[in-house]
Amino acid sequence: MQHQSLSVRNSSGISGNRDENFPSVRSSKVTVKTASISAKMAPHTQGSNLTIKQQYQPHQWPWNTSNNTNATNSNNVQSNNNSSTATSNSSTNSNNSPAVNTPTTQNQSQPTTQQSNTALVAAAAAGTLSVTAVNKLKRLQPTTHSEASTNTRSNSTNTIASGAKRIRTTNVEKVNKSVGTNTTGLSGPPGLVAVGSSLTTSAANATTTKKLTQMAIVAASNTSHHHQQISTAGTTTTTITKNAKNFTASGNADLCNANKITAGRATTLKTTTASSTTTATAEAEAEITTTTELMTTTSTVLQQKSIIKTGPVKTSNAASLEKYLNLLQQQQATSITPATTLKKVERKTARIAPTVSLTRKVSHSPQGGLGVGQPKKPVTIAPRTSDPKLSINYNQQMVATTATSAISTGNQLIKQQDQQLVKSPQSTVLLTTIRIPQQQQQHQQSTQTQQQTSQNQSQPQQNQTQAQLQAQQQFKQVVQQQLQLSSPPRTPTKLGSAVFQFHPQTTTVMPNLVQIPNLVPTQPVSSAAAKLNAPVVASSTTSSPTTANLVMNNATHGLTATRLNNGTTQLYMNGAVIKLHQIQQQQQQAIGTAGQQAPTPQQSLPMDSATVSMGLNGLLTKSATLSTAASTISTNQPAHQAKAFTLHAQKPTQLYQQANTSTATAYTPQPFFMAPSGQILLNTAALPTMLTSASLQQALVQAAQANIPALHPLQPSQPQSTQLPNITAIIQQQQQQQQQQQMLPNFHQLLANIPQAVLQNLQSTTKLGQTPQFVPIPSNLFLNPQNPVYTSSPSSSSFTSPITISTSTLPSGSTTISQPLSPPPLVATVPTYTTTAKPIMNTLNNQKIIIASATSTTSSKPPPPIKPISSTEPPKLVPVQLNKPSISITPVISNPPKLVPPSAPVPKLVLSASVATKATSTTPIKDKPKPNLPMSEPPALAPASCTPPLLTAPAPLPVASVPSPVLSPRAIDNKSPPALNPLSLDCGSSNDSGIVANSSDTEDKSLTIDLCSPGSPDSTPQKKDEESRQESTPSPVPSPSPLSEPPVIPAESEPEPEPEPELEPEPEMEPEPETEPEPEVEPEPEDEPHLEEPKIDESSEAVELPELEDPQPSPPLPCELPPPPTIETDLLDTLSLPPSQKSPKSLLLEQIKLKLPDQPDDQPQESMSSDQDYSNQSPLDESSPTGSAEPSESQRSTTPVDMSPPSIETDFLNTPQMTESAKSPILSQPKTIRFPAQNGVHHNFGRKGFRRLSDGRLFGVCYWSNCDAQFDTSSKLLDHLQIQHVNTQTGPFACLWDGCKVHNKESCSRRWLERHVLSHGGSKPHKCIVAGCGMRFGSQLALEKHVNHHFNNTDNASAGKRSSDPPLPKVLRKTGKKLRYRRQPWSARRFDFFDIGVMEGLQHRLIMAGSVASARRGTVTFRGQAAGRRVTGFGAEVFVKWYPREIISDDWIPEAEVTSTREISIYELNPDQRFELEAQLKTNRKANAELLFCLHELNLKLQAEASSTSCSRSSFSSSSSSSSSSGCSSASSSLISTPIPFNSRTEPKKLRKPPKQSYQPSSSGTTSSLSSVLSSSASSLLSNENSSSSSSSSSSSSSSSSSTS
């Protein structure tokens, strides 16, 4: 549907162009300039006397606005071509709403591409409110769209523009742009929406002013239909339909999408103008609706008409401020939220001030023309402050969505929630102007006041919601949005600006905003769902003044769960869903601490992370189905908007009551899923799961209550007094809600969906006065659909799992929750964590969720640390994340893939975060608790049992505990748990806290991982390396051994001893914290393998067996400083730090290191073999050889120089020398110098070096007959030709140049010959006559000029410096530049990689090689063994087998010629034989030594028969040869036997084989006997230079070797 541009309504007149889709009222101020809105200026709502600055949301409006954002008087093509665009507009208005809006606007904008002339819009809006793109009244864009519809509409352009801007809106950028005004980073309009809602609800009077318009926009943004309205300004019905379709994303709502958008906006306006609803003024108010369209969704058309009727909205600018205040008051009365109204008024005032001072100074007076230009000034507008109140906007949007249609709410909830998560931190900034109270509620800072306000607001909102749900869900949305604007409590808004704030909250302001945004996603998906959701939202957000507190904790926990269960109010946050799950997990942990989260998990269990994401679609789908009903209801809803809003406010109480009364019913709603189309679908299969999850949560709650004390310390963070008022408000609201719910069956359904346990948890949380806003509700509600998925954390504790789920599902969701409560929970968490390792770990899991959601919640239910699935991790995570709630949680989400958490809770911090990050998609919560202390963790813990005390110490540190979830991805990899750091006690304490701290920095996942990494602050780099190696070769079996063997590992080569000692003190305790739920793990290292495996299983994404195993070995390594360097592979694997998991790269590096020579002098052969074994067995973690190899590897890294020094070649091959050689680049590259150093011929011939002529001849070479002279330069060649070949001729003159065309053709002209030879010798025959100048020129004239320059004073100095011969080729000279390309071969000579060091090394190696080849250039001595004898015609023959075997063939030798040894030059061996010889030298030396030694014994026996003279001679020759080649026989000696490891003959071969350890050559005297033994044995390289004595030496060597042996 294309929206025709809406004419600006004068305050007095109704006439004007209206959007085709809906007759939304538009005051002149309401008129939105598309161009100006497109501009990145905060939209302004200006009355004649009132200028309302809207939060600057350059990204939000873009959905509706065309790409042109720059000109006040510019034709902006606003096209809502795709539902995503429309949603973006809504998201701009509200953080949470965008998700829903995107579908709605998208539907509208696709059909409608509106170009709005900003100037025209401003002119039209002169009478009423005019919104300019500069002012950034993106919310008011509907008017712009209406006007734009007048102009050419281009769907493609609009879509692009919307998409581009929309992206901005989705981001947190907008929050940053407007300080005071932008409450939500992405939904600047949310603040305005709140105001707009009031105005809309009260009458069109306030709508007249820009502020009113902005308020309407804010409401619309909450509804996240603002852009949709812009798109649908022309056609009310169409817009409504599109909104429904967008939210629902179902074919059913295709017709209703535009109506839905309009209806949503109208609903908001209706709520505001419920009292002054008049059909007569519907047309005039269509434009106002454009301003406030964002607020209205399903019933936007009728409501907008009513708004248009409203005189105040239409009133001229002069009356805008007064009317705006009046409207606010009216809205307050309607919604029964006086405090909210006051806040709205304040926001208006704030907006007015910012409007003038902001980006562009546009006069506050509402002028049609100015409207275009004004949008710039409201970059930071008070209305944006509504954005900070994520919960309020969210609630409002929720209500509006419910009233308008479940479909609209579905998409809005999804996107708005994501945006809200993104923008939640910014909501804090926006709080400064108007939205501070709401934001505080969200943040629990102004929890009490906001709770009270929420109560006031929520009741009217719930009432309105009921009426709206009955009449029109759209109106309900409008009312909610308006109430949100006016009242801090975040009532069920449409997930508009509030929801968009989610992301900001996740970052910084997350604690409060995040909490509410979590609730925000719980928007009704269908009319019935909307009704149910609206009460739930109202109760969750509006029920308590501190909507963020109780709503987030209780309402969010319970209501959100019910929404998820119902599928109507499922908290489908676009990006917030995951965050909500994380928050839910945290909240669940907190509630588990309070003992209230059992019911919440029940709700959340039915919904998986997939269910949540799918549920969003399903919710949208349902919304589409319900959109028609919502539209039908929307007409009647105007009067009931206030009631619906009130119902929402009261809904928490009703929710609790109904949950208590009908837990099964609560589970039934959980089956509702969001279909990809956006509809809510009931999953019958989910019913059993819901029931099971409900029972599970109860059981978890009971189990977790034991750990509540640990969690309790975390909870005190929030003042109980603040929560208590919330509780009172909630109770009052509950009563109202019960009444209203009776009126509205949907509310009852929603309450029924909420489990009794959830309601009880909410109530108990409120009683505790811990402001469990986030923890109770969000964790379960958000996780409700996917508890099984998040089971890893829920299993530990029902409460925790929802939070964990939210964390994993929404990167910023958990952060959002943690913000408000983060500081206090840290302390509490730390104590709990410190108190008991396991309880602490459990607490960490629970607290993590609590902290992520809110620390106060944890305090509320302090008693037992929750052992629930994710409870283990929260304690650490909670403290860390509290510091940086938004960031820390988000990182956790990002990390989830790495996390092993589900099955490896051992790294509690990491695990909790990772589990949350995982979004609990891998395993149900139940499963996680067991693996919670990752089975692999316990061994690590045992080695690092010192860690538990450290954990206790870090527990206080856990201020960064919250970030611990962030750590999860890396923490699991590098360091299993922050607190239960397998690394070492240091890891446990400082590392734990450090990990927590890093975790708190959500952005710094890597930091978190590093802290947790095996080389934590305590562990040294080597330690990390070892851990990485161990990880590379994890061995599940060794896990039990690590505890027993930890001492051995550290000694091997880890500078980690320092951290290790810490771990040693309490090896058992460490496991406990890690496996908080499972005490068994801590004491028993044996469990480690089992835990390890489960851990791996649970962390399907990030966790790998090596990673799990690594954490286990890690802790032992730290504790094992004492053990000797030699450690078996099993021990090493076991000792490998669990936290430091090796990536494929690290594994490869480890293997490479293993292959590198790293053998101590004491046992070179063994080390070599062990290295080989390790490299071979490294994949097998359990193999003991690997263990030994690992120590050697660590030694290698520690003391790689420990190679036998005597052999240069070996040293050179050793790692250190290799490093040196690596230093000279040429060693690894071709080592040929490109240009000869002596001559610069190449230089003369340009870049190509020696160039060739066309005939292929080289330059510089004289091809004259009988002349082979060569010259470096062409100049020299020309001189040679002139002097030797031309001047010598007396005539006739002939050219004797080979190949010359005129070869030997006589000429009578010497001058001709002189010119001719220039073609052969060069093109520049004329040489400068000045001494020292070798310049040549092609012409005499050029030479003359040059020579004259020599005598010019100016050129004298420089002329002499020039090179004698310019080597420039023609190609270079063609450029006209005097190129001196390579006068000197600088590139080759300057960068010669054969530097002095390299040459010395080569020389040394040559010397060593010479010693090896001193005999006959190197020979191999084979030992022969007589295997048989035969008699032939020629005589007796003996069959001799030569050892080593299979290198040379065995043969029959005449008996008289049989010798025990045989020397063969290595150069005489064929390639196959040489290959076999190399293979022999590389084989296990021990085995070869034994075999060779046995053969040697046989040879000795044979040699005994030899003559004594030959024996003595061989001894002498062998000694001399061995002395000459002391380093050459080490390889053969190693092959022969271990007893001969020092044989020098082996050295050269070893040098050639880097992997083989080099052995120190023995003294020459000793070497002689050893070398003889080696030569007799077989694989030594003989260095004897005398070939004549080689035969005798072979026999004598065997005899001498026998004597030696």
UniProtKB/Swiss-Prot annotation:
Transmembrane segments: none annotated. GO terms for cellular component: ESC/E(Z) complex. Residues 1053-1090, 1099-1110 have a biased composition (Acidic residues). Keywords: Chromatin regulator, Metal-binding, Nucleus, Repeat, Repressor, Transcription, Transcription regulation, Zinc, Zinc-finger. One of its GO terms (molecular function) is zinc ion binding. It is found in: Nucleus. Coiled coil: none annotated. SMART domains: ZnF_C2H2. Residues 1-28, 60-117, 359-388, 441-468, 856-877, 917-947, 991-1213, 1352-1371, 1511-1605 are annotated as: Disordered. GO terms for biological process: chromatin organization; regulation of transcription by RNA polymerase II. Residues 1-15, 991-1000, 1165-1201 have a biased composition (Polar residues). Belongs to the AEBP2/jing C2H2-type zinc-finger family. PANTHER family: ZINC FINGER PROTEIN AEBP2. This is Zinc finger protein jing homolog.
